[in-house]
């Protein structure tokens, strides 16, 4: 930790020397990063399995492939994004030009979580590098195998004064948060997000906080039940439910509860087999502490399906809980695991009222073909992002900003929004010397009269 101030000092010097700003240099380094991800693909897949038991398909589709696509998307558009932008000038500034110049903040701290240890480390890094910043990357200590490969990958692409890895536990994060970064990007829990924001506020460092919360899923009676079941099971139990935008609890119209739950059971068997907790391709819980926490939630309801566990591999079968009380522990915090509390409803107003009573979630999912129901939910509920008739997929399009609202986060990224997040928009007025307006000066006799005519 004694080296952390030295790392920051070297990064600031590297940035001040202008090494990160030339467009062609940024494109070239992103190209190298993409190639390095491809080169290390097999090692990354093995590491993701070692740390989280992610299957090869899951590892590629939710981690490696997302990163490769993000780099490709950014590289195709970076030249356009980096250009100074002319904007309109009001009559009061006649003869002048107004320009917005995108410029990097400087040295950025990225604190990444353990649940998607590759994607959630490299996706913000891509945006920061594209914008012209240097980056200090703090990976999670809970995924050491991925961190080891990530360290090799980063060092093969970037000089250490450009991108550096700072590995370790909470003590390293605490030390980093005391440094004079120019921007902080954090992905993690609400509780730690508050600590990050408090530390940043002491130095007036701007932040993006990608947090979480209890994301509801609503299935109305007119939904395509079979399709809804498969998409909910996919969204909830991918990565063993350890996804910040996974459905956290489920509202089902009372008329279709039996049909939907039977289809969900069928989908669980289809995806993960008759004993998911024994399936080597089904994800594991990241730590003993988190595993025990999730096991305790099983006491908060009656398993409609699931509930089995494997303590040797920290696995819990996909579980649907019913007869859950609103004030039970499983409904008081983000679950972050393969447990899905189920509630029934009679009219959509009940659901809207219950969701409104909670902090604004990171995601919301609605299954319906009824436009009025869709308008009622989307128009009355605030959430970071979501899907109608699907789950998770809004996070996979680079054309949409991804981020939270309220307690679920501050700021957004992905695609252009990643570049935008790590860019200061410098506003410049270039004034003409060909003429001057005398009325603007305090010595003008008719200045106030002219100003009143113009500014009204």
Swiss-Prot record:
GO terms under cellular component: cytoplasm
Reaction it catalyzes: an aldehyde + NAD(+) + H2O = a carboxylate + NADH + 2 H(+)
Catalytic residues as annotated in Swiss-Prot or TrEMBL: 210, 244
Keyword NAD: yes
Highest taxon, organism lineage: Bacteria
CDD domains reported for this sequence: ALDH_YwdH-P39616
GO molecular function, one term: aldehyde dehydrogenase (NAD+) activity
InterPro entries in the cross-refs: Ald_DH/histidinol_DH, Ald_DH_C, Ald_DH_CS_CYS, Ald_DH_CS_GLU, Ald_DH_N, Aldehyde_DH_dom, Aldehyde_DH_NAD(P)
PROSITE patterns: ALDEHYDE_DEHYDR_CYS, ALDEHYDE_DEHYDR_GLU
Alphabetized UniProt keyword annotations: NAD, Oxidoreductase
GO biological process: aldehyde metabolic process
Presence of the UniProt keyword Disulfide bond in the record: no
Pfam families on file: Aldedh
EC number(s) per entry: 1.2.1.3
Family statement: Belongs to the aldehyde dehydrogenase family.
Protein name (record): Putative aldehyde dehydrogenase YwdH
Source organism of this protein record: Bacillus subtilis (strain 168)
